[in-house]
Structures are given as structure tokens and as C-alpha cells.
Amino acid sequence: MSQITEEQVKHVALLSKLEFSENEVKSFTDTFGKIIDMVEMLDEVDTDGVPFTMNVADNLNFMREDVAEKGLDREKLMAAVPEKEDGFIKVPAMLSDGGDA
């Protein structure tokens, strides 16, 4: 099995702004190791001569014409906003200062 360490899981959690209990760290360490083992097994499959496939489904993206349209009236929008600052909508902070991430 690939050697994924608990320190690596904790580092990824820090970068992702996630907090895990010690039991969760151990569980994720085991799970990530198994996932990497599976990917390594797939890497060993001989794909010589197999045509490149971007998508196995015949899904097509149908795009609409890009047309400029009048947006919301800024004054009406700002009148409905509970908190604003310097002409911008003020919302609660979602992330801290970033720390070591």
C-alpha cells in the first residue's frame, strides 16, 4: 500500500481549511492510501493502441448565443442590501487570514 502519512492528511486538511478528529485523520490516511493504490494499479494497465477518449458519453454542449443584456439596477440592489461599505456589499468573512495555508 502507498505510504500516505497522517502528517500529509493533516497538511491537506490545513490547506483545505478542514478540521478532522484523530480518528478521522487515521480513517482518511487509510482511505487515501487505498485510492492511490488503485490509481497506481490503473497506471500499470497497458493502453497501447487504445484510442484516446475524452468522454465515453455522447453528450454535447449546446451553447446559446452570448447576448449582452441589461443587468439589475445598482441603486435598487444596494437599497435592498442589509450592510454595505464603500459602495460594495459587505458579507461575513468566509476564510481567516490564511495562516500557513
UniProtKB/Swiss-Prot annotation:
**What is the main EC category here?**
ligase
The record's annotation in Pfam families points to: GatC
Report the record's Gene Ontology biological process terms: glutaminyl-tRNAGln biosynthesis via transamidation; regulation of translational fidelity; translation
**What is the E.C. number?**
6.3.5.-
Molecular function (Gene Ontology), one example: asparaginyl-tRNA synthase (glutamine-hydrolyzing) activity
Record carries keyword Nucleotide-binding = yes
Q: Which Gene3D superfamilies match?
A: Glu-tRNAGln amidotransferase C subunit, N-terminal domain
Ordered alphabetically, the record's keywords are:
ATP-binding, Ligase, Nucleotide-binding, Protein biosynthesis
State the InterPro entries in the record: Asp/Glu-ADT_sf_sub_c (IPR036113), GatC (IPR003837)
Q: Which reaction does it catalyse?
A: L-glutamyl-tRNA(Gln) + L-glutamine + ATP + H2O = L-glutaminyl-tRNA(Gln) + L-glutamate + ADP + phosphate + H(+); L-aspartyl-tRNA(Asn) + L-glutamine + ATP + H2O = L-asparaginyl-tRNA(Asn) + L-glutamate + ADP + phosphate + 2 H(+)
PANTHER family assigned: GLUTAMYL-TRNA(GLN) AMIDOTRANSFERASE SUBUNIT C, MITOCHONDRIAL
UniProt subunit comment: Heterotrimer of A, B and C subunits.
**Family listed:** Belongs to the GatC family.
Q: What does this protein do?
A: Allows the formation of correctly charged Asn-tRNA(Asn) or Gln-tRNA(Gln) through the transamidation of misacylated Asp-tRNA(Asn) or Glu-tRNA(Gln) in organisms which lack either or both of asparaginyl-tRNA or glutaminyl-tRNA synthetases. The reaction takes place in the presence of glutamine and ATP through an activated phospho-Asp-tRNA(Asn) or phospho-Glu-tRNA(Gln).
Please state what the protein is called: Aspartyl/glutamyl-tRNA(Asn/Gln) amidotransferase subunit C
Q: Which organism is it from?
A: Lactococcus lactis subsp. cremoris (strain SK11)
| Name of the gene | gatC
